[in-house]
């Protein structure tokens, strides 16, 4: 499935149905008078957050959404039926933004089942019965129905994850997320192997949490360099960041600083999020070098440094313990029991 995290669509609520021009015609009633009913209301545009969707790719192929109009009124003072609401299903975490320079936030759907009645359908037109007065007892005018509302909007998907992975390209983020989940992210010995965000669910000590891997950041990413800046929005909602630094980099302190500078430049308080710093790919190093690099990285970051290897699995469980602690003990998994709560992590 292709991943798309933003789309521009046109939406229009339904027009109101026209009122009816009708006169009462019954036996023995010579002057029946007007009895045209009002038109029905047009359908609303409704956005609904749906679990199980994780991309906006469908909106690349269908960009215009129009609700149906209300039905016309009828004789015998019958009001037309209202047009059905048009429900547009989007992934949980979708924001609806105005098509202006500021991209004004109009709605934010963060829970499955959440609905927003976004555009109201037009009211139905008046039937001729409503125009009857003491001086105009047989009116023939009627209302055509009010038009619905219409606008262009942007949809932007911000994935909902408890923890976010950050780091330079080729820092081993995809290998890590594959090791602790069943995300099956693409892995390669070259930069920008990951070109779109990946989500995985970690099952650890009877609890589950979601972790997101975004494409690697390079210097100048906040200004558009590389591909990572576009996807930084996906970690805005994360409670904690796991910052992986490749132990094989020429200067681990510089590698750490480049990513932190880009987080600060991006804004959205990413720089203020709790962070766990980890030295990755330690399976190729001896203990003495690991200790030296960890000390160098700790001096630069001001945080304790954990050492791990996504490839061999060394040091992963303590990192998951720290993530679970930082997240704040999410809800137990559906199959958790008292014995499992003390068990090891496992991908699900």
Curated annotation (Swiss-Prot):
One of its GO terms (cellular component) is cytoplasm. PROSITE patterns: G_OBG (PS51710), GTP1_OBG (PS00905), OBG (PS51883). The keyword Nucleotide-binding applies. One of its GO terms (biological process) is ribosome biogenesis. It is found in: Cytoplasm. One of its GO terms (molecular function) is GTP binding. Mg(2+) binds at residues 174, 194. An essential GTPase which binds GTP, GDP and possibly (p)ppGpp with moderate affinity, with high nucleotide exchange rates and a fairly low GTP hydrolysis rate. Plays a role in control of the cell cycle, stress response, ribosome biogenesis and in those bacteria that undergo differentiation, in morphogenesis control. Belongs to the TRAFAC class OBG-HflX-like GTPase superfamily. OBG GTPase family. Monomer. This is GTPase Obg. It comes from Sphingopyxis alaskensis (strain DSM 13593 / LMG 18877 / RB2256) (Sphingomonas alaskensis). The gene is obg.
């Amino acid at each position: 499935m292709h991943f798309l995290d933003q789309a521009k669509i046109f939406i229009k609520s339904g027009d109101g149905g026209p009122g009816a021009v009708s006169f009462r015609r019954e036996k023995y009633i010579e002057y029946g008078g007007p009895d045209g009913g009002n038109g029905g209301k047009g359908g609303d545009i409704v956005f609904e957050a749906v679990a199980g969707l994780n991309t906006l790719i469908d909106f690349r192929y269908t960009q215009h959404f129009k609700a149906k109009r209300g039905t016309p009124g009828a004789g015998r003072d019958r009001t037309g039926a209202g047009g059905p609401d048009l429900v547009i299903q989007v992934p949980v975490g979708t924001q609806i933004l105005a098509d202006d320079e500021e991209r004004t936030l109009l709605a934010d759907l963060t829970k499955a089942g959440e609905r927003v009645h976004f555009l109201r359908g037009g009211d139905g037109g008046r039937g001729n019965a409503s125009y009857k007065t003491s001086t105009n007892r047989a009116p023939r005018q009627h209302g055509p129905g009010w038009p619905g509302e219409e606008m262009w909007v942007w949809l932007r998907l911000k994935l909902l994850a408890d923890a976010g992975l950050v780091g330079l390209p080729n820092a081993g983020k995809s290998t890590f997320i594959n090791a602790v989940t069943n995300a099956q992210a693409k892995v390669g010995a070259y930069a920008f192997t990951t070109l779109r965000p990946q989500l995985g669910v970690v099952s650890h000590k009877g609890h589950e949490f979601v972790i997101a891997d975004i494409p690697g950041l390079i210097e100048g990413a906040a200004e558009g360099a590389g591909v990572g800046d576009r996807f930084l929005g996906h970690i805005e909602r994360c409670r904690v960041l796991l910052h992986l630094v490749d132990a094989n980099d020429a200067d681990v302190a510089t590698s750490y600083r480049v990513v932190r500078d880009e987080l600060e430049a991006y804004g959205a308080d990413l720089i203020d999020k709790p962070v766990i710093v980890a030295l990755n790919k330690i399976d190729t190093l001896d203990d003495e070098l690991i200790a030296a690099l960890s000390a160098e990285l700790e001096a630069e970051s001001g945080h304790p440094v954990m050492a791990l290897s996504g490839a061999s699995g060394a040091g992963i469980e303590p990192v998951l313990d720290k993530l679970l602690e930082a997240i704040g003990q999410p809800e137990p998994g559906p199959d958790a029991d008292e014995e499992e709560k003390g068990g090891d992590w496992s991908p699900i």
